[in-house]
Amino acid sequence: MKQSKYVAAFMIWASAALLPVGTLASEQESWEFGASIYGWFPDISGHTSFSPPGGGGDFEIGIDQILDNLEFTLMGTFDARKGRGGLLVDMIYMGVGNSKSGVREGTIGGTPIPVGASAAVDLDLDSWIWTVAGYYRTVDQPEVKFDLLAGLRYTDVEQKVNWNITGNVASIPVLDRTGTAEAGLENWDVIVGARGNYSFGANNTWFVPYYLDVGTGDSDQTWQAIAGLGYKFHWGEAVAAWRYLSYDLPSDSAIADMNFNGPAIGVTFRW
C-alpha cells in the first residue's frame, strides 16, 4: 500500500508537470538528449542486522567493517528535454562483497562479541538504485543552467552473510556461533531537488556541475549531493565529481542506515 501511494503521488505530479511541456516549447524547438556512462567508487558505510532462518539471536555488523571490495558496477543516466521541461533517469547497480577474519565489532543476540572472541564474516551486497524525475529549467543562459526537479527514488538491496565466531565463545549460545542469513529492503521515496552548472573559460568549455535532492517515503530520509568539474567537447562532455548518497532508514529495517560516498568519473554523449 505504501508503494502504490508513492507511485500514485508521483504520477499525479508527473501529469501536472510534464504535460505542459509541449505548450512551453515552441514548434521550432526540438528534443535534446543526453546519455551518460560513469564509474563511481564509493566507500560504503551503515549498519545491518540479520535474523538466522533457523532461530537464534540476530547477527548485527557495521557494513563498513566488512565491505571494501567493489566487485561489479553498472551506472548510467539518460536525459531528455524539449524547451524548458524534461525527464531524467539515473540507474546504479553495485555488486559488493568481501570476507574478513578477526572481526571484533558487532553483536550476536544483542550482546557484543566477547573479549577473546572474533568472527570470520563473509558479506555480499547487491543494490539497484533508480532515480526518475521530471524537471523544469528556470534559468537557461550560456553561462548558467538551473533546473528544479521532483520524482521518485527506488532502492532494492539484497545482502547475504556467513559468520563463524571462534575463541572465547562460552557466553555465546551454540546456535549463534555460526550461521548464514539473508536480509534486504525495497524502498520507494519521493524526492525534490535542484541541479545546474556554471560554465567558464574560453568558449565556456569548462563547467562546474552540481546536483542536490532530498526525499522521504519508505525511508525516514534520503538525500544525495553531487559536485564536480567538467569539460565540453563537440560530442558531449567529460566530468569528474564527488557523489554522496545517504539513507536514514526505520529502526526496524534490516538495514538501519546506509551511505555511499566517493569520487565518480564519466562521459556524456549529446544529440
Explain the meaning of each model-derived region.
Residues 22-31, 139-145, 200-206, 235:
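Short loop/turn motifs that connect adjacent beta-strands in outer-membrane beta-barrel proteins
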Residues 1-30:
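Cleavable N-terminal export/targeting peptides
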Residues 225-271:
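Predominantly the C-terminal beta-signal and adjacent terminal strand-loop region
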Residues 39-43, 63, 82-84, 91-97, ...:
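Transmembrane beta-strands of outer-membrane beta-barrel pores
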Residues 35-37, 76-82, 132-136, 150-152, ...:
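Residues on the lipid-exposed face of transmembrane beta-strands in outer-membrane beta-barrel proteins
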Residues 29-31, 70-74, 126-130, 144, ...:
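Residues that define the transmembrane beta-barrel architecture of outer-membrane proteins
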